[in-house]
Structures are given as C-alpha cells and as structure tokens.
A protein has these predicted regions:
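Periplasmic-binding protein-like
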Residues: 195, 290, 315, 319-359, ...
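Surface-exposed binding/hinge segments that line
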Residues: 118, 128, 162-209
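Extracytoplasmic/peripheral linker and loop segments enriched in polar/acidic and small residues
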Residues: 126-128, 371-372, 422-431, 458-527, ...
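Gly/Pro-rich hinge or "lid" segments in bacterial periplasmic/extracellular proteins
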Residues: 104-108, 180, 191, 199-258, ...
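Ligand-site clamp/hinge motif
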Residues: 245-290, 411, 420-422
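N-terminal secretory signal peptides
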Residues: 1-21, 28-30, 43-45
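N-terminal lobe/hinge region of extracytoplasmic solute-binding protein
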Residues: 71-121, 151, 220-224
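Structural transition elements
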Residues: 227, 347-384, 402-405
Length: 548
C-alpha cells in the first residue's frame, strides 16, 4: 500500500471521511476497480465484492455526459502556461494541464503526475512519477518532461512567471532524471516545504512536454489532464472535450467543459443567475450578495491564506519609522472590516504572515495580542515619531475585487488620527506594470492582492525577505531572515512552530505591511453541479465534476 493509499484508509477508519469520499480519493489516485476492491478487502474496510460493488455504484451515481459552463475573468493576455499570472489564464490552463501534486482544501497535497515523494535531506527531493500516462497527442509522459519543465521555469532567459518562486531554491540544471519515471531535485538550499513549490500553489508549475514551444498552448491538445483543449478564442473563452485516455479510471464523467470569459464579476454573477453558466469559479463577496439568496445556487466557502497586503515603504518618510507603521495599524477596526467588506467571509489578521490555515501558525496566533482599533495609542505613537498633527500620503492600488472599497475604508479609518489619505486607484495592468515601470513596487503606500499560498515559506519568501523579488515594502530585517532560514530547514513540526513564533514577533513589531484579514474563498455552483473538487478556489481541478 502506498503512503497515499494508507493515508486515505486511515482517514476513513478514524472517521475523517465517508466511504464514498474514500473511494473517490482512491479513484483519483489512479486505482482500478479491482485494485480498490483488493485494497479495501485487505484492510478490513469491506469484502472485495462489497468494495467493487461500491466503486461501481460510485461511478454509476455520477451522471455521464453534459458540458458544464464555467465563468472567469478575461485573461490579461493570450494564455501561456509558462508566463501566465492572472486568474482567467490560470483556470484556462488548469482544465487540461496537471501538476506533480495538487492541494486539498486543508492544504495537504494529493498526488497527480507524481505518485509519491520523499526527502533524504531537506535540500534533496525525489519524486516517483505516475506510469501509463499519455499526453493528449498520444505520446507517453516520462521523467524527461519533468526535467524539461523545471529547467524551463528556472531559466532566467525564459521569463517564466515562476522564476521568482524558485529563486534561491532551485536553479536550472538541478533536476536529474534517475530513470524513466523518477526524478531528483537538488536544491540550492534546504527547503522542507518544497513539494508545495511544484504543486498548483506555484501556478506555472504545470508539467509540459519536453518539446513545448512558447505560444503553442492555445493551439490545443497539450496536456495530460482530464480534458483536452480544442478551441481557444481570445477575450471570449475556451472549449474542452473529455480525455478518453485519462489515467484515472472512470473519469472524467462529463463530455466536456465550456469556459467563458467575462469582463468583471458583475457580469459573471448575472450569467450564473440567468442560467447561462453553471459555476462561478472564484467569487468575491462584494457584488455577489444576490447569489446567496438564490434557491438554485449553492455558495461554498473555505478558509485560505489569501490576503490583501497594505504595505508601507520602510525606506521612505514617514514610514521609515516603525512607530508610524504601528500607528497606522492601530487605526484599523478589523472586526468592522471583516463584517463590512466580507459579511464574515474572512478572518481578522494580525500583521504577520502566518495564516490561520497553516499548521505552524498556532503559536503566533496564540501568543501575539490581537491588534484592535486604538486611536489614543495611534496618536501617541505618531507624536513620538514627530508627527503630532498627523501627515498626508497617497495610497495607490488596483481596481480589482473588493480592493477599492478596502482603500476607502483605510482612508476613513486613518483620518481620526490625523492621517489624510488621497486615493489613486489604477487598472490592474497599469498598477502591476512591467519592467522598470511597476507602480506596486514603487509607490510609498499600496495594496496588493496576494493569492493563497500553500505554506508560510511560500507566502513570506517573495514578499518579506530581504531579497524578495516582490518586496513592495522594501523591508529587510536580518533577524526575520535568519528565523525564516531556520524555519525552512527544520523538519520537526513542534520546533517549526516555535521558530514561526519568533519570526512572527519580528514582523508584528516591525509592521512592514498591515494584514487586516485572511479571506475565506467563495465559489458558486448551480445545484445540478456535483463532484467539483474543493481546494483553494483560486485553483481548479475539474476531474470529478458531473451534472444531474
């Protein structure tokens, strides 16, 4: 029995999942009907005959056929898996491409093109690859494809959107083929959470054919996933058909998928309400309230590590004094923010990057006092920093989801302390820019939408380490870097929790960014939709979807 199979059976035996969920998990792991029957019989879950009957029933209850219609935002540019960065492009690729592993809703990892992985030491990781997998053109998936994929992503000349995620951790040429279905990653430094970097939490880590050419994805028939891209129309959408040779037996259930692009969330909501769409994949609360009362629609909610970083440039006055940054933090009414912007579909943050969903966040959450609005403290800190009458600043951000409303909230909350904020809201492409013109990395004060990450290291690395490529606060703290380096090396979970507390204390005290809330992600489905995997709703695994 593999580690994955053992874990699934153990979760069933301890009451953490139903028999139906157990069988679905084993099917997703690629086991055949007879293999599942034998496994469940050998572990005493049921007899072989009972188990095989249950598996067949599981398949039978999922109605075959139909074409579910998904909605997402228009991709910023033509979709290429190596360079994509926004939601619409990510979903377009995730329907037909696969990763080595994929996150579950509790942020544990499910094997996909890798069946297992292990580390002999924190800087060396070996992955065993799934056998019998074919590309959509009929050729066989092998270790050569995995080596080529990560050489491509880590090549500075390629301009991969994942280059920043792998910087300082994995370099080009450091993935070795051991045999046709096993590879070893030789890391630049110890990184205990490395499997998350090759999962869907690094969007661009799609496994592509060894001979992949930039710009060829939208021509179709590239991937190993449950659906095959057959048509892509810029600004309009994409069409997929079921992969008849998919490696997971009995899947997919539906005949295909239609992905439709919309200009904004309002248009997506209207399409779902009108019956022109079946699933709104990643839904903000603001602008979607009408859906919650619809009798034909289910709204799903899960906790996540997604947040909005309200950063302050620590290398520019007045934010070069941490007392000013702390004063700003004490102006924020986080409870009102969670209720007003999210109607409770968020959790209060406390200005450190250890999200409640991470296992190592227990001690930071327990031991760091939750900040609450305290104007007396804010004014005291401002006076000590030399700003008894407050100051003026311009907050620049993007016109995306609830962020403009959040900016107005900040403006209103800071005013009683004498901090007068002027708002500058730009479209997304302008705000993030390119090359030497990237306002979000240059403005003195800004808000950034941070998508969910699988671990604290993934979240912290690009944004808060001294050499972080997306360090919009321009914050560099030697103690924090030292703590995170120790965190990345430590295998013992208990010890990691204590290191996390030390790192969180530094960030909490320094306050380079205000993390006022952690988002509970939302997805809306018509009630005839079943089986769509629940992971982070910023990610998509459509394998098990069916329609009734």
């Amino acid at each position: 029995m593999s580690k994955q199979e053992h874990r699934l059976v153990e979760e069933f035996l301890t009451g953490q999942m139903s028999r139906r969920e157990l069988i679905r998990g084993l099917m997703a792991a690629g086991l055949s009907v007879s293999a599942i029957g034998g496994l469940l019989a050998s572990t005493g879950v049921s007899t072989r005959a009972e188990a095989e009957s249950l598996v067949e029933a599981q398949h039978a209850t999922a109605k075959k056929g139909g074409t579910p219609r998904f909605t997402t935002l228009v991709p910023a540019a033509d979709v290429d898996p190596v360079t994509l960065f926004n939601e619409g492009a990510i979903f377009t690729a995730q329907i037909c491409l696969e990763y080595l592993c994929f996150p579950r809703k509790d942020y544990t990892l499910e094997p996909k093109l890798a069946t297992s992985w292990h580390s002999s030491q924190p800087n060396t990781w070996t992955f065993n690859l799934r056998k019998g997998v074919k590309w959509h053109d009929g050729t066989h998936f092998t270790a050569d494809d995995v080596v080529a994929t990560f050489d491509r992503l880590t090549d500075p000349k390629v301009n991969s959107a994942a280059l920043s995620a792998f910087k300082g951790i994995l370099s080009k040429g450091h993935v070795r083929k051991n045999n046709s279905h096993q590879v070893t990653f030789h890391l630049d430094r110890s990184y205990v959470d490395f499997p998350y970097l090759v999962s869907a939490f690094t969007y661009n880590s799609f496994i592509l054919p060894k001979n992949y050419k930039a710009g060829s994805f939208t021509k179709g028939r590239i991937g190993t996933g449950p659906f095959v891209l057959t048509k892509y129309t810029p600004k309009v959408g994409a069409t997929y058909v079921a992969n008849k040779h998919y490696w997971a037996k009995g899947l997919p259930h539906v005949a295909g998928i239609e992905l439709k692009y919309y200009s904004d969330n309002t248009a997506q909501v209207l399409a779902l309400q009108a019956g022109a769409a079946d699933v709104l994949l990643d839904m903000p609360y603001q602008g979607s309230q009408a859906i919650f009362s619809s009798p034909d629609i289910n709204v799903l909610s899960i906790p996540s590590s997604a947040y909005r970083g309200f950063h302050m440039r620590v290398d520019q006055k007045p934010f070069n004094d941490k007392r000013v940054r702390q004063a700003v933090a004490y102006c924020m009414d986080r409870g009102a923010l969670v209720q007003g912007l999210w109607h409770g579909f968020a959790l209060p943050g406390n200005d450190h990057a250890f999200a409640p969903i991470f296992p190592t966040s227990v001690l930071p959450i327990a031991h760091l006092p939750q900040r609450h609005q305290n104007y007396a403290m804010a004014k005291k800190l401002l006076a000590e920093a030399g700003f008894p009458n407050g100051f003026k600043a311009t907050l620049t951000t993007e016109n995306f989801l609830e962020i403009p409303q959040y900016a107005v909230f900040i403006q209103q909350q800071l005013k009683p302390a004498g901090i007068n904020i002027t708002l500058n809201v730009e479209d997304q492409n302008t705000y993030y820019g390119a090359g030497a013109n990237q306002p979000w990395l240059q403005v003195p004060v800004g808000i950034v939408d941070w998508a969910p990450r699988g671990t604290a290291s993934q979240l912290v690395g690009p944004a808060y380490l001294c050499k972080g490529i997306w360090n919009s606060a321009h914050w560099c703290n030697a103690a924090f870097n030292t703590h995170m380096a120790a965190y990345d090396k430590e295998l013992n979970l208990g010890k990691r929790k204590h290191i996390a507390l030390q790192a969180a204390k530094v960030m909490y005290d320094e306050t380079p960014s205000i993390i006022a809330y952690w988002i509970k992600e939302l997805r809306a489905e018509r009630k005839n939709v079943h089986g769509l995997a629940i992971s982070s709703f910023a990610l998509l695994d459509p394998t098990g979807i069916s329609l009734s």
